Structure formats: C-alpha cells, structure tokens
C-alpha cells in the first residue's frame, strides 16, 4: 500500500530553554520552517519527550558492576499497576495539558522487548532472567532455561510497553505517540558495516506489530558517528529510514516516520556535523519516504554560555538555511 503524502515537518527537540539564563534565545528557530514549542519549552505544545517515565522494571547500574533492582528488575517480575500509576503522574507533572496534540515521545532505553536484542549494557536483564529460571529449575538444560527465560521476558516486556502506550493515548488522545528508537535496524554496527538492517532484526520487527500498530508515529534514531566514512554515514540513515517506512507501509494506519537526528557526531559530541553531512542526511531521510525530522539535543550541549553561543551560531549559519531548503524542496 502507498503511504499517504504528508507535509514534511522538522521539529526542534533541544533543551535550549537552558540558554535563557545567559540571555540567549532561540526565537529564530521558527523562521527556518522548524516546529518549535512556544516559549522554547522542552516539554511543549509541538513535541514532548518523556525520559524513562513511570517505573518500568529495570536493573539500574551502580558502581563496581552492582545494580539496583527497580520494580522487580525485569518485566516478568514487575508490578504493572505501580508503573502505570507513576507513568500518568510523570506525564501530568511534566506536561499536564490533556489536550496536547503534538508528538509524544516515550524514551525508554533500559531493555528491549526482544530478548535477543538485549546486548551491551542491557545484557544484565537477560542474565537476570536466565538466573531466575535456573533457580526454579536447576535440572533443566541450558537451552530449555534460556528458552523459558526468553518467553517470560518477552511476554511481560510486551505487556509493559503496550499498556504504557495505550494509557498515553487514552489520556492524551490528540497526540501522536511513539517509542524513541523503534524500529531498530542495527546497521552500520561493527559486525554489520552495511546500509541494510540486520536480517534477524527485520524479522523481529515484523513480530513487533503489536507495538507499531499502537504507535501513530515511528521514531527511528539516525545519530551518526564520526568514525564512519561520509558514505557510511549516509548509508546508516538510508537503512534506518527505509526499515521504518517498510514497517509503516505494512500497517493499515501507515504511521508517520519521523527520524531522530542529532547535530553533533555521537562519538564526538564537541563537533557539529559538517554542512555536507547535514544536507546529505536530511536528503536521505526525505528521499527514502520519511515524513520529517526531529532535531534532538542533549542538556550537556547547552549547559554553558559558550556552548549556547556556538549552537545558536550553527543554527543561524548552517542548520537553519538547510532546513528551509529541505522543507521547501520536499513540500
């Protein structure tokens, strides 16, 4: 099915309100065809991101490899009632407007609902889940234990993510909701230095229609790394946008695809993207069927006067003019 033709929108999701204390304002953002929360609020009318909201079960790292168990530590041990209650409290406190009709982003990155995908600093949730089953069934073989752990984890991970999304939609009906980063692609990773997504991940994305069916917007992340060649940077964006568009095309309601994009290199956060990298990555998002871009920034990008000045200068001279060009060309 062909996706509906939509206006290509670019959003400002940068905590530039932190620059107000230095007498620096970012009122020009809107001049560049960028949707900008009124008063430069970080949680605002156009876009609101909620970091680790509620009380998702998680193992929170402490020093020396220890961790704190939050709400059972893993989804199959968690109390969903407590989580959902806290989730609504968080939303009401952070952005109380129940008529919110912008983009609502749930940013939860402690674990992923596909058991296999919990590697790196998420691996701890896998290990914890396996240990739980092993303690219960000490005589089972390794494979059986892992299978059971995976089954339990995925069942309840789905429950937590799905119910959270449904509740967000129920209490903020007019907003477009989605989880940051999904669908994942795992392209341009050390083991997969190609534009195409990891084949297994694509199959797993197909199994996650329960999530994407409930999202009005898909929010793949296309932050790029300096260590990649310029062509690889473009390839990273291409693969991730294509996969999100593929998922959207397979859904009846064809959710919008808005790519999360950061103006610095992920592995070199003191360096702004070159003009060429900005142009090429923006074009790549548009060419591959994306419906827009969310320009993201970290609080540590704007925590001093000099950083605020640099970002403002970059917006006025590099980023702004390119966003105008891209939005006008595409629309």
UniProtKB/Swiss-Prot annotation:
Keywords: Allergen, Disulfide bond, Glycoprotein, Glycosidase, Hydrolase, Secreted. It catalyses: Random hydrolysis of (1->4)-linkages between N-acetyl-beta-D-glucosamine and D-glucuronate residues in hyaluronate. Its EC number is 3.2.1.35. Expressed by the venom gland. Glycans are attached at residues 79, 325. Pfam families: Glyco_hydro_56 (PF01630). It is an enzyme of class 3 (hydrolase). GO terms for cellular component: extracellular region. Coiled coil: none annotated. The active site is at 109 (proton donor). GO terms for molecular function: hyalurononglucosaminidase activity. InterPro entries: Aldolase_TIM, Glycoside_hydrolase_SF, Hyaluronidase, Venom_Hyaluronidase. Gene3D superfamilies: Aldolase class I. Disulfide bonds join 19-308, 185-197. It is found in: Secreted. GO terms for biological process: carbohydrate metabolic process; defense response; hyaluronan catabolic process. The keyword Cytoplasm does not apply. Belongs to the glycosyl hydrolase 56 family. Hydrolyzes high molecular weight hyaluronic acid to produce small oligosaccharides. This is Hyaluronidase. It comes from Dolichovespula maculata (Bald-faced hornet).
């Amino acid at each position: 099915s062909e996706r509906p033709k939509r206006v290509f929108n670019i959003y400002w999701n940068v905590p530039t309100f932190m620059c107000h204390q230095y007498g620096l304002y970012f009122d020009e953002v809107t001049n560049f065809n960028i949707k900008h929360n009124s008063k430069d609020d970080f949680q605002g009318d156009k876009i609101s991101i909620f970091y680790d909201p509620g009380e998702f079960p998680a193992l929170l790292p402490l020093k020396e490899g220890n961790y704190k168990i939050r709400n059972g530590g893993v989804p199959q041990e968690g109390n969903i009632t407590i989580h959902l209650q806290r989730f609504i409290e968080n939303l009401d406190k952070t952005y109380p407007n129940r008529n919110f009709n912008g983009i609502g982003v749930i940013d939860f990155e402690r674990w992923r609902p596909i058991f296999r995908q919990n590697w790196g600093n998420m691996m701890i949730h896998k290990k914890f889940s396996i240990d739980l089953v092993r303690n219960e069934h000490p005589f089972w073989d390794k494979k059986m234990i892992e299978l059971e752990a995976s089954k339990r984890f995925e069942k309840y991970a789905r429950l937590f993510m799905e119910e959270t999304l449904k509740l967000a939609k129920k209490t903020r009906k007019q907003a477009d909701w989605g989880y940051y980063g999904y669908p994942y692609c795992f392209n341009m990773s050390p083991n997969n230095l190609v534009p195409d997504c990891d084949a297994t991940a694509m199959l797993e994305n197909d199994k996650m229609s329960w999530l994407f069916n409930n999202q009005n917007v898909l929010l793949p992340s296309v932050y790029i790394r300096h260590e990649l060649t310029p062509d690889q940077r473009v390839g990273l964006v291409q693969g991730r946008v294509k996969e999100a568009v593929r998922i959207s095309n397979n859904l009846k309601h064809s959710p919008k695809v808005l790519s999360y994009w950061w103006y610095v290199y992920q592995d070199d956060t003191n360096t702004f993207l070159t003009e060429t990298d900005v142009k090429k990555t923006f074009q790549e998002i548009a060419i591959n069927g994306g419906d827009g871009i969310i320009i993201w920034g970290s609080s540590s990008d704007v925590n001093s006067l000099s950083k605020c000045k640099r970002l403002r200068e970059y917006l006025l001279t590099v980023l702004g003019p390119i966003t105008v060009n891209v939005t006008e060309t595409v629309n």
